[in-house]
Amino acid sequence: MVVYDLLVSLSKESIDVLRFVEANLAAFNQQYIFFNIQRKNSITTPLLITPQQEKISQIVDFLMDEYNKNNRRPSGPPREQPMHPLLPYQQSPDEQPMMPYQQPPGNDDQPYEQIYHKKHASQQVNTELSDYYQHILALGDEDKGMDSTLKLPEKAKRDSDDEDGMFSIKN
């Protein structure tokens, strides 16, 4: 209601400026903060502020003053005590005191050893499989008399030759 009364009391030009401010609020906040800092820091040097920016800063100053008048805290010393005083912690008689963590009795290294051996065994199987596949590939290469590089099968070679012939340029 207070804002509505303020808007009614402002002139039409000021309302247009407020609409502009509302539309560009993020950019305006940065500019307004910058201009206020600049205005406070430069007492002797004149500022290059457009009339529209000056009106905006005046309107915002006015609105902030009105807001601060209406929402002023009651004067007096600041409250140092919290609203609800903190009660000291009291331990109930059936609550047991905190004990430091104790490891259960037994061999602590056993689970880790089991995990390590399982992981090691799976790595060993993978190594054996890769060795086996390498051996099979080597045997296949020896049987065909080919070197170890991969080559296309004969049918694939023929298909690719036909495609090349299809797009060849004939003079």
Swiss-Prot record:
Keywords tagged on the record: Late protein, Virion
Main location: virion
Residue ranges with Basic and acidic residues bias: 141-160
Induction field: Expressed in the late phase of the viral replicative cycle.
Region (Disordered): 68-124, 139-171
Subcellular location: Virion
Gene Ontology CC terms: virion component
Family classification: Belongs to the asfivirus H171R family.
Protein name stated in the entry: Uncharacterized protein H171R
